[in-house]
Amino acid sequence: MIRVLLADDQTLVRAAFAMLVGSDPDMEVVGEAATGLEAVALARTARADLVVMDIRMPELDGIEATRRIAADEDLAGVKVLVLTTYDTDDHIVDALRAGASGFLVKDTRPADLLAAIRTVAAGESLLSPGPTARLIARVLSAPQPPAGGGPAGPGMLSDRERQVLALVARGLNNTAIAETLGLSPLTAKTHVSRIMGKLDARDRAQLVIIAYESGLVVPAGAAADGN
């Protein structure tokens, strides 16, 4: 059973999410928070496995609430899925930097939200396709650092690892990566683990941040275009 805490300042939104989550036999709503401070407090007392967190809330916004949850050693197992009307790049980056394991916009289909909760609760990371595509577009247009020029330089990754990183950054799971590259799921998982180790990333979501900030992902036509 996945224990879910809902954090949103709008009562009707919380009620709708509670009804949806409660309809799934594998999920249970263990608390509702109307402010960021309430979300942090309830995360400590309700023994939630996952927090569905809105960004815009009074007293403490969802990003800072996420940061406090992620920094609390007693809440080390609690995952945060940010669900909001905001889908700007800065909000996505801030949420992932704060420790969120996923980011979805509120126009997500109900079935996709439930699937996202399962994915994040299982330890995977998840991003809405639209925002992810925009992030990657910015990554690909960013100046590339010199190979091996820093602790997270492209020279640290093999060609295959760069391919895998590009697919991770686009939101593909290990099975989809394996199918795309003609690998076994176990081999894809091994590549992802090695990349996370080399780049000192805590999870797949942070790999997107690393790609976004360092330009590790190179577009297929970059060499021809001179980018």
Label the predicted regions.
Residues T35-E38, L60-R67:
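Acidic catalytic/metal-coordinating carboxylates
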Residues D26-A34, L42, A201:
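Short hydrophobic/Thr-rich beta-strand motif most characteristic of the beta2 strand and flanking loop
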Residues M196-N227:
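Basic, Lys/Arg-enriched C-terminal extension of HTH/homeodomain DNA-binding domains
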Residues D8, D54, T84:
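Active-site residues of response regulator receiver
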Residues M57:
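Receiver (REC) domain active-site loop signature in two-component systems and cognate sites
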Residues I92-R97, G102, D107-D159, Q163, ...:
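Short, flexible helix-to-coil linker/hinge segments that flank and couple to helix-turn-helix
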Residues A46-V52:
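Active-site beta3 strand of CheY-like receiver
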